[in-house]
Amino acid sequence: MALLQISEPGLSAAPHQRRLAAGIDLGTTNSLVATVRSGQAETLPDHQGRYLLPSVVNYHASGLTVGYEARLNAAQDPVNTISSVKRMMGRSLADIQTRYPHLPYQLQASENGLPMIQTAGGLLNPVRVSADILKALAARATEALAGDLDGVVITVPAYFDDAQRQGTKDAARLAGLHVLRLLNEPTAAAIAYGLDSGQEGVIAVYDLGGGTFDISILRLSRGVFEVLATGGDSALGGDDFDHLLADYLREQAGLSDRSDNRLQRELLDAAIAAKIALSDADVAHVEVGGWQGDITRSQFNDLIAPLVKRTLMACRRALKDAGVEAQEVLEVVMVGGSTRVPLVRERVGEFFGRTPLTSIDPDKVVAIGAAIQADILVGNKPDSELLLLDVIPLSLGLETMGGLVEKVIPRNTTIPVARAQEFTTFKDGQTAMSIHVMQGERELVQDCRSLARFALRGIPALPAGGAHIRVTFQVDADGLLSVTAMEKSTGVEASIQVKPSYGLTDGEIANMIKDSMSYAEQDIQARMLAEQKVEAARVLESLESALAADAALLSAAERQVIDAAAEQVRAAAAGEDADAIKEAIKNIDTQTQEFAARRMDQSVRAALKGQSVDEV
């Protein structure tokens, strides 16, 4: 069945013309850039054949250096050598100083409290530093592709908030890049393995990088990834493996001088080399500080086992947050260079009860997924006749009581996307609910565009507000919409794939957005009035039900007062004054409090009738 395409105005793809796009993994420790050539995604190396670019920038009087050269300056020029800047993105200075108290940089606050780093190149913010890393990656891609990039997809952690995501976009703009989309890192890894086509279910992405560990639980449905839960440890990564092994080697070699920075660097380099060797061999030979000896994989495993256990504890918490069991996970994707360690792969496999996916280089997998997505978004996908969109041009939502529109997915949300919201019944014994899908920016149904209607039947007959209906909106990478409604206690479900409809023109979309701004104040007032009328109807219906059941609890005088208050609500609700309705509701609430208390006492006595104190 064809679906409704929700198009972004002003965009058009030219399938016959190949456009240059790249995927960028802007990492905490290292960054990469990848592209699709001849139908295959590949990471792009520098002139020395190195794919990784250390996420390090050194600023000096005559300019700056990025990557390996910058990292070499870290020991002798720590103040001007900025690394792990991703940790600072979108955070206030106070937050950074609390989280990372031992940073060697000279930090000060900007006027709005954001961090500024004092360097030989001047006062710089994290966005500018990130932009310099992105420029280096873009230059690599431009040279390899012999042309300027038409667009990039940049990956970000799934837990990045709006400020951190906006900071990443700002950095790209400073670097002169057109961002097609920010893509969640776990989603990019899943795309690299082709998990976005043909499968549905739960996927875990285990990402153990140099300085951080992230676990993401995703649900894939009809090509849309929904992030169910994220977790991890921002202070745990492969670097910790290296330091543990370096300390072990120091002890074995009898090297007690910890003030010798050169020796510390030598120990760390030896530890890294041994760790890499032990991924393929059972024994690694080490020479450091005039000492030489062997370390076995078993010894290394004993050292790092507690750290690996910590990652699995985070996995367990994430699964609990997602509400799924380990055995429900269809695939486990491994990301990050530290997942090459055999013990990590073994323990993760045991935890999830399946062999993790490791066929793609874990350092490259996120960049490769981003490149695949960039190639699609820029219009190079050969088998796609549909425009692939960056954002939803107009908000999507549902009609609620009173002719109001409840927005579920706001305009300008990047796609693909899945969002869910819970609704409840309005009347006692309600067993069906009409779902009316809307598109637009206004507050009232009459001012928005109707997309579809369907009904959810089989809702349990409960008091008003007793049933909980979860409505999920999904927009896939082609901008196509489907809506599902499910009653949570029974699992009864209904859905709709929105049928083809005449699309809106660019002018119509622009007018809808313009109207939402022009009529904003009027719309808010209309919404407040409608909400108060809905609340008045709910209060009167509840009161009518209570009086029908328990009017005997009231004296004639009390009943008269309540009836008068109810009439006041009816009269106010018939008018157009939201404040008057609100006051009438407040008054009837006051007048019925004693009645509500008596009904509660009666219910408690009935529930306890015939029971002893011990039974209670």
Swiss-Prot record:
It comes from the Bacteria. CDD domains: ASKHA_NBD_HSP70_HscA. One of its GO terms (biological process) is iron-sulfur cluster assembly. InterPro entries: ATPase_NBD (IPR043129), Heat_shock_70_CS (IPR018181), HscA_NBD (IPR042039), HSP70_C_sf (IPR029048), HSP70_peptide-bd_sf (IPR029047), Hsp_70_fam (IPR013126), ISC_FeS_clus_asmbl_HscA (IPR010236). Keywords: ATP-binding, Chaperone, Nucleotide-binding. GO terms for molecular function: ATP binding; ATP hydrolysis activity; ATP-dependent protein folding chaperone; unfolded protein binding. PANTHER family: HEAT SHOCK PROTEIN 70KDA (PTHR19375). Belongs to the heat shock protein 70 family. Chaperone involved in the maturation of iron-sulfur cluster-containing proteins. Has a low intrinsic ATPase activity which is markedly stimulated by HscB. Involved in the maturation of IscU. This is Chaperone protein HscA. It comes from Klebsiella pneumoniae (strain 342). The lineage of its organism: Bacteria, Pseudomonadati, Pseudomonadota, Gammaproteobacteria, Enterobacterales. The gene is hscA.
